[in-house]
């Protein structure tokens, strides 16, 4: 310190103090957003919407992900595709052409500007809206959808801030409309089989889970003017944390009955250095290209640890940058054994097929024969034909429509969407506070303690 000139030292000290003040203000704002607010309506746990003979559907966003939903909906019975909205004419034309080729009526089309979706929402012949837009639009569009008297089905993540999560929850409770974040991985064959096994006690009392989104997506940086990379790349310059937690976390949460007898209590998070995106840009783009002018701050690998109120632990990882095979981990450990994914393998002490729990059993067929989930037994072949991430997309949409047409509760509610999505911002808060733990908001306002556990869905 003696080498620092007094004036520079005072400047440095002032800057440090200002930084601490800013950090304290941010943490104070976060702390105030954690506390439950006065309830504007009533809980939507177990919400059942009036039965619909035919579900009338509107789509906001029919580009990459949205078009895949349009394709899947064309295979479903009991639905009418009433209207679509997007800001890009080419993807609108593609969606309309596909719908007409499937011998369905031509939908109404809305475009022109970023707010054209409001014209779609003003219609009185739409029951549900499928939202597949860039992340920052998810919460506002879901809120406006419910305000317009429609059920919202939104892509992941549901929201990007704690306050947005509360706003979506509050709107669902006030309007008594469904807001389901469409976590498709919960409907994968392996994930549903494991849910079935957990509910039948195969792994004993649950202790620990591991979830991840490990998916090398640097190539999306080459999508400059349109498609996912044209907007998703910039999130690596805005935040440092787990940008995309729900694909791995959703299934593990349902195994553990999160928000239905247990809930997330607190989280701590760490990130590696942010190196890979800049290196990729340097290698793949000219030196003066915009991708080389960006400052990438999101750590290449983020690892967060969650503690539940019942004392269980969950590791959640995010890595869309390093060169490695795809994985969601999908590990669930109990007092009697463990399942782990990528590749699928099982070890149990009692109730298995004679193998030692000291070695992995990687022969899944006998486990499928015994524990394959009722949903996959019912529509698995149809799902495999129609596709969508191995069939999970079709199963999810089929199940959504089934529940709406038969007056059943959806498998995922607004509290799930908020709890799984908020890991994004909580991981950032923890990182900004030297990886100290941060508290999860209780979006159920205590109702998790009496909520009915999630059973073997669709059984």
Swiss-Prot record:
Taxonomy, superkingdom: Bacteria
Binding-site residues for NAD(+), renumbered to this chain: 64-65, 86, 135-138, 155-156, 184, 244
Keywords, comma-separated and alphabetical: Glycosidase, Hydrolase, NAD, Signal
Signal sequence, start to end: 1-31
NCBIfam families, A to Z: TAT_signal_seq (TIGR01409)
InterPro entries: Gfo/Idh/MocA-like_OxRdtase_N, Gfo/Idh/MocA_oxidrdct_glycsds, Glyco_hydro_109_C, NAD(P)-bd_dom_sf, TAT_signal, TAT_signal_bac_arc
Organism phylogeny: Bacteria, Pseudomonadati, Pseudomonadota, Gammaproteobacteria, Alteromonadales
Physiological role: Glycosidase.
GO molecular function: hydrolase activity, acting on glycosyl bonds; nucleotide binding
Entry's cofactor comment: Binds 1 NAD(+) per subunit. The NAD(+) cannot dissociate.
Coiled-coil ranges from the UniProt annotation: none
Name this protein carries in UniProt: Glycosyl hydrolase family 109 protein
EC annotation from Swiss-Prot or TrEMBL: 3.2.1.-
């Amino acid at each position: 310190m003696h080498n620092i000139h007094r004036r520079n030292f005072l400047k440095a000290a002032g800057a440090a103090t200002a930084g601490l003040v800013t950090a304290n203000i941010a943490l104070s704002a976060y702390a105030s957003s954690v506390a439950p607010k006065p309830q504007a309506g009533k809980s939507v746990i177990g919400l059942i919407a009036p039965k619909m003979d035919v579900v009338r559907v509107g789509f906001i966003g029919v580009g990459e992900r949205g078009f895949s939903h349009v394709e899947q909906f064309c295979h479903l019975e009991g639905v009418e595709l009433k209207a679509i909205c997007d800001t890009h004419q080419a993807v609108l034309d593609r969606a309309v052409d596909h719908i007409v080729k499937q011998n369905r009526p031509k939908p109404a089309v809305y475009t022109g500007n970023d707010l054209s979706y409001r014209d779609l929402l003003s219609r009185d012949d739409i029951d549900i809206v499928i939202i597949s837009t860039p992340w920052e639009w998810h919460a506002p569009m879901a809120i406006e959808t419910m305000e317009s008297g429609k059920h919202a089905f939104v892509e992941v993540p549901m929201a990007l801030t704690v306050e947005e999560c509360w706003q979506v929850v509050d709107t669902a409770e006030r309007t008594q409309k469904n807001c389901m974040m469409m976590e498709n991985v919960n409907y994968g064959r392996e994930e549903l089989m494991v849910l079935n096994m957990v509910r039948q006690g195969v792994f004993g009392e649950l202790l620990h889970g591991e979830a991840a989104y490990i998916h090398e997506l640097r190539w999306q940086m080459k999508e400059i003017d349109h498609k996912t990379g044209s907007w998703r790349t910039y999130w690596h310059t805005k935040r440092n944390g787990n940008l995309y937690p729900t694909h791995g976390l959703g299934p593990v949460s349902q195994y553990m009955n999160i928000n239905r007898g247990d809930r997330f209590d607190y989280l701590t998070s760490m990130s590696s250095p942010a190196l890979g995106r800049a290196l990729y840009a340097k290698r793949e783009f000219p030196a003066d290209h915009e991708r080389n002018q960006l400052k990438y701050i999101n750590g290449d690998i983020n690892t967060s640890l969650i503690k539940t109120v019942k004392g269980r632990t969950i590791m959640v990882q995010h890595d869309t940058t390093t060169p490695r095979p795809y994985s969601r981990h999908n590990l669930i450990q109990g007092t009697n054994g463990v399942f782990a994914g990528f590749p699928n393998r099982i070890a149990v002490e009692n109730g298995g097929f004679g193998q030692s729990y000291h070695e992995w059993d990687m022969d899944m067929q006998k486990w499928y024969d015994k524990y394959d989930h009722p949903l996959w037994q019912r529509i698995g072949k149809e799902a495999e034909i129609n596709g969508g991430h191995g069939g999970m997309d079709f199963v999810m949409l089929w199940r959504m429509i089934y529940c709406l047409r038969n007056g059943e509760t959806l498998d995922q509610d607004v509290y799930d969407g908020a709890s799984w999505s908020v890991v994004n911002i909580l991981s950032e808060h923890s990182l900004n506070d030297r990886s100290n733990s941060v508290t999860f908001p209780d979006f159920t306002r205590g109702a998790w303690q009496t909520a009915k556990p999630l059973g073997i869905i669709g059984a």
